[in-house]
Amino acid sequence: MWNEFKKFAIRGNVIDLAVGVIIGGAFGKIVSSLVNDIIMPLVGLLLGGIDFSNLSWKVGKAVVKYGAFIQTVVDFLIIAFSIFLFVKLINKLYERVKKQEEMEETEPTLTKEEELLTEIRDLLKQQRETM
């Protein structure tokens, strides 16, 4: 069982996934800081000095922090848009590689007669040039 787990854990897909999760977590923190510390204060300033992080409704003892929710929605939208752009870039690169592979496959292959004729032509050109 241990050997099976080692094979599973060492496979490229699992390691790629782990790296993706770690980088995704770090990227999420960067985006959260961008939203909380830069974007939302500027939006609040444009809307008359509103501090979104403190916006809330008080209903009895319950406090509904809708300002924090707005910040989280903006955070999500930025992350989702970034992922969309990244996936779009990866798909474009994949299509480019696929087209290049198809072009390489469709390059005409010469028959033996054509190869011989090409060699003869090249030899004749060389002879003319040396004369």
Curated annotation (Swiss-Prot):
Keywords, alphabetical: Cell membrane, Ion channel, Ion transport, Membrane, Transmembrane, Transmembrane helix, Transport
Recorded GO MF terms: mechanosensitive monoatomic ion channel activity
Ranges that cross the membrane: 8-28, 30-50, 67-87
Localization: Cell membrane
Membrane-related topology note: Multi-pass membrane protein
Matching InterPro entries: Mechanosensitive_channel_CS (IPR019823), MS_channel (IPR001185), MSC/AndL (IPR037673), MscL_channel (IPR036019)
Primary location: membrane
Pfam families with a match to the protein in the record: MscL
CC per GO annotation: plasma membrane
Chain's role: Channel that opens in response to stretch forces in the membrane lipid bilayer. May participate in the regulation of osmotic pressure changes within the cell.
Family: Belongs to the MscL family.
Subunit and interaction comment: Homopentamer.
Name by which UniProt lists this protein: Large-conductance mechanosensitive channel
Gene name tied to this protein: mscL
